């Protein structure tokens, strides 16, 4: 049986896309996943261009599999994702052993691109932006466990000065409303209990309705909430500018919507937010969070932060630290600023030293880590509804699951609980997870 190896970098959208690549090639050629490139007939790198030196990391990984191509000329090597979208044919020019280069919007054409490569003997490059076409050509998703991702829109039209996403994934394009609802209903009918709605700017969703007009994100959430079998709803990633009052009110009336929100802020300084072209102030962000917690008092908040953005002073950074403490963020994706080619900020003077950037990042992460541990400790003694995702990472005899507020819980229980909800009493708070005991453990083993 032919095998496919996919290495994925970056965001959950890329994780979703990698699953779809595997689905497409399984349907077309019967390829099944392997965890080792040495066993593969097709090797794909699904790349991310958000972080520094992303291109060099891709070529480094390509270099590590070049010998496999030399040993087996029939091996197909492909590069997809955002670096592929940025670099295009330049990838083949630098690494001539690459067979296919494709963007996030053309992954559905993989079987065709591979067939053309075999037929012509020439590398194939397709990094076009055919809007939402790919969703019409994807096979039904595989269901593994009780949770699934559903992509509802692609791209971003915000053009923050530091970000490459609008250039690599294109402008915002929403899937038709009925297509999203049909996919969610199909997943629920196949046993999926938790749905995560995905998009680069997911709350900017404006899906076309069959009867005319559009559905906004709040309406989509309300309709997903009504689908039988769906018991928990998440979404990522959102933008503060699209956090409408209707969406905020969903936290007061949709109990299936989890008590966790990832809402990127990037900085606590109005001056830096303006330089980033974020389109909101610190006060406006704080107002959004206040309104959200009026609707859902136990809402846990995570965010994205960039430290050392061009022009960031000590006062700017202290404003970020103040915001972190005021709003009690308890998780983050936080990074040192690095120039991304083709973005407006790449022309700014990168005037914060590497040493200072590192110091600031360490302070920020330590503060958020302390706040996260405070939340974890506050959960000890409570009973949490946990969706079992698999075996515990460090103990194969235990199960691991996730709470509504996005905490990992490890506890003893039989493997048949995979994909099921279990009530778990939290007994211990660890730095990055919780331990617990299933409330009805005596019945779980029968």
UniProtKB/Swiss-Prot annotation:
Q: Any idea where the Radical SAM core domain is?
A: 142-376
Instruction: State the free-text cofactor note.
Output: Binds 2 [4Fe-4S] clusters. One cluster is coordinated with 3 cysteines and an exchangeable S-adenosyl-L-methionine.
The MTTase N-terminal domain extends over: 2-119
Where [4Fe-4S] cluster 1 binds, per the record, is at: 11, 48, 82
InterPro entries, sorted: Elp3/MiaA/NifB-like_rSAM, Methylthiotransferase, Methylthiotransferase_CS, Methylthiotransferase_N, Methylthiotransferase_N_sf, MiaB_methiolase, rSAM, rSAM_horseshoe
Q: What range(s) does the TRAM domain occupy? A: 377-440
Its keywords, alphabetically, are: 4Fe-4S, Cytoplasm, Iron, Iron-sulfur, Metal-binding, S-adenosyl-L-methionine, Transferase, tRNA processing
* Iron keyword on record: yes
EC class, as a word, reads: transferase
Instruction: Show the GO cellular component annotation of the record.
Output: cytosol
Q: Does the keyword Transferase apply?
A: yes
Which superkingdom heads the taxonomic lineage of this protein's source?
Bacteria
| Assigned EC number | 2.8.4.3
Question: Matching HAMAP family, A to Z?
Answer: tRNA_metthiotr_MiaB
Q: What does this protein do?
A: Catalyzes the methylthiolation of N6-(dimethylallyl)adenosine (i(6)A), leading to the formation of 2-methylthio-N6-(dimethylallyl)adenosine (ms(2)i(6)A) at position 37 in tRNAs that read codons beginning with uridine.
The record's similarity note reads: Belongs to the methylthiotransferase family. MiaB subfamily.
Name listed for the protein in its UniProt record: tRNA-2-methylthio-N(6)-dimethylallyladenosine synthase
Species of origin reads Thiobacillus denitrificans (strain ATCC 25259 / T1)
């Amino acid at each position: 049986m032919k095998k496919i190896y996919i290495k994925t970098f970056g965001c959950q959208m890329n994780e979703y896309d990698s699953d779809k690549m595997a689905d497409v090639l399984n349907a077309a050629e019967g390829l099944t996943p392997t965890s080792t490139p040495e066993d593969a007939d097709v090797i794909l790198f699904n790349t991310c261009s958000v972080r520094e030196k992303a291109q060099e990391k891709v070529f480094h990984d390509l270099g590590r599999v070049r010998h496999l191509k030399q040993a087996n000329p029939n091996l197909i090597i492909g590069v997809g994702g955002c670096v592929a979208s940025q670099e295009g044919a330049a990838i083949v020019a630098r690494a001539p052993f690459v067979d296919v280069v494709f963007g996030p919007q053309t992954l559905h054409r993989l079987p065709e691109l591979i067939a053309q490569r075999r037929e012509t003997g020439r590398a194939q490059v397709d990094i076009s932006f055919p809007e939402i076409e790919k969703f019409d050509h994807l096979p039904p998703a595989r269901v593994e466990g009780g949770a699934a991702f559903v992509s509802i829109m692609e791209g971003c039209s915000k053009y923050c000065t530091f970000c490459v996403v609008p250039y690599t994934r294109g402008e915002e394009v929403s899937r038709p409303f009925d297509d999203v609802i049909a996919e969610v209903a199909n997943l629920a009918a196949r046993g999926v209990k938790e749905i995560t709605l995905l998009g680069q700017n997911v709350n900017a969703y404006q899906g076309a309705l069959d009867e005319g007009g559009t559905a906004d994100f709040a309406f989509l959430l309300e309709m997903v909430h009504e689908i039988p079998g769906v018991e928990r709803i998440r979404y990522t990633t959102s933008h503060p500018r699209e956090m409408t009052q209707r969406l905020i009110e969903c936290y007061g009336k949709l109990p299936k919507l989890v008590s966790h929100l990832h809402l990127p802020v990037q900085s606590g300084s109005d001056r830096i937010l303006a330089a980033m072209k974020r389109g909101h102030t610190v006060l406006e962000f704080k107002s959004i969070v206040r309104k959200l917690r009026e609707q859902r008092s136990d809402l846990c908040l995570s965010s994205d932060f960039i430290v050392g953005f061009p022009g960031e002073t000590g006062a700017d950074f202290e404003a970020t630290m103040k915001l972190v403490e005021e709003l009690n963020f308890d998780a983050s994706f936080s990074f040192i600023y690095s120039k991304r080619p083709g973005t407006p900020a790449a022309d700014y003077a990168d005037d914060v030293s590497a040493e200072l950037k590192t110091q600031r990042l360490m302070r920020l992460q330590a503060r958020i880590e302390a706040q996260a541990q405070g939340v974890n400790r506050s959960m000890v003694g409570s009973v949490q509804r946990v969706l079992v995702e698999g075996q515990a990472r460090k103990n194969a005899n235990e199960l691991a699951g996730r709470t509504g507020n996005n905490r990992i819980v490890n506890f003893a229980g039989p493997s048949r609980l995979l994909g099921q909800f279990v009530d778990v009493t939290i007994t211990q708070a660890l730095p990055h997870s919780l331990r617990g005991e299933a409330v009805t453990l005596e019945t779980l083993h029968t």
